[in-house]
């Protein structure tokens, strides 16, 4: 089994292009959460020529809608959202400089093409492990679109956030490649 890769943010294109499907990764640093409602607001703002609340250059976006935090915790359960919900907005957002996305599930061909063009890696966090994932989140702070509730744009400080590369900058798809050996029974 391959060794776990430790990444510290920001995620540069150079580092992103070195990651390959199947790589096990632990991320430490700042990542940003945003789901479909926030993506819709941001792409509409860009269409109007407005500036976004953060500079997305070399950032990682986590498709997350957390549950409320228990007293003393920075966040509640923090499992991934199905990434396909963001696909309509993703090519536009990748043009803003995002270099990593964290979610679950397959992506559209338009997203895969944009990932290859912009040097972006797609990571999967394990669905169903939301409470465990939350333990790697040390701070959660809403920075824009507070009216969207759990879908607001937020900054997360993470330590050893566990994920796996499921889409690399060459267009490889772990959901397909990982299953291939088991289809020939």
State what each model feature region is.
Residues 12, 32, 67-69, 170-172:
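Short, glycine-/Ser/Thr-/acidic-enriched flexible segments
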Residues 90, 164-185:
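Active-site/ligand-binding-proximal alpha/beta "capping" segment
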Residues 2-11:
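Short, structured beta-strand/loop micro-motifs enriched in basic residues and often containing a Trp
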Residues 33-161:
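Feature captures the catalytic cores and cofactor-binding loops of soluble hydro-lyases/lyases
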